Amino acid sequence: MRLRGIDVAAYDPSPNASAVLDDVMADAVSAWDALGLSTDHVGSLTLYASIEEAVADAGLIQESVPERLDTKHSTLAAIDAVAPADAIIASSTSGYKPTDLATSMSRPDRLVVAHPFNPVYLLPLVEIVGGQQTSLGTIDRAMDTYRALGMHPLHVRKEIDAFIADRLLEAVWREALWLVNDGIATTEEIDDAIRYGFGLRWAQMGTFETYRIAGGEGGMRHFMEQFGPALKWPWTKLMDTPELTEELIDTIAEQSDEQAAGRSIRDLAQERDRNLVAILRALESVDAGAGKTITNLRALQA
């Protein structure tokens, strides 16, 4: 929001919240500068000592507390009690359905899930999910608001745990855990399989368009007829997960440490951002995928 020139009021009880937010903002400005986007009119950030002060004049309120239902209930209830009547209340939850989140609220009609992806200043997707009592007006306003921020709002029309993207990621994560657990691949080898292979295809074309090409002139129907039966082969363990024993956790942690090769989390995050900037600029040059959102951002800044 601040990169779009919007003043932000925040509440975070963490004693180092200000320093963490300053670091994130510095990385965000650096990334936008690398994309050639304007950072001349960054909005202000004011940290308040209470939720009541932080939301007093807000038009959009983004709840991003830890993924504990009781914590979210108490936080959303506190926001709901003092937020302006026309404010959109959005939860960043990655898994809870909005109907389950809204049980502590007197105005559940103004709650949506608005699930972003990290780093939010470079990944444009935000999943918008309404609950049973969310008004259509709230959903429409949320879609318009996030679009005006330069994001790509995706309306998830039916409530489901974990929405769309995280359900897909969970399937890959489960299989990756099995591959490490069974000694078939290391964490680095699994990451290599993604970043040197299908990850590049996914970044610009997704799954279904990729498989449509694989179907040749017969398209998706031919692909499904040819490869559909393989879904019944015992290749995967997607409906099961290995037990997270101390041994498995140690193995993954040790392999991940080796893979990092001494780079700090900040080093890795900045490397990630540089790579994402390069990918976004390449996609923008051919008007494909998330590159379109960069084009839209330039138009919004013009």
Predicted regions and their residues:
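NAD(P)+-binding Rossmann beta1-loop-alpha1 motif at the extreme N-terminus of oxidoreductases
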Residues: 1-34
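NAD(P)-dependent Rossmann-like dehydrogenase/reductase catalytic/cofactor-binding core
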Residues: 4, 151, 187-302
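Helix N-cap / loop-to-helix initiation motif
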Residues: 14, 135, 185-189
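Rossmann-fold NAD(P) dinucleotide-binding segment
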Residues: 51-111
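Rossmann-fold dinucleotide-binding core
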Residues: 91-158, 162, 166
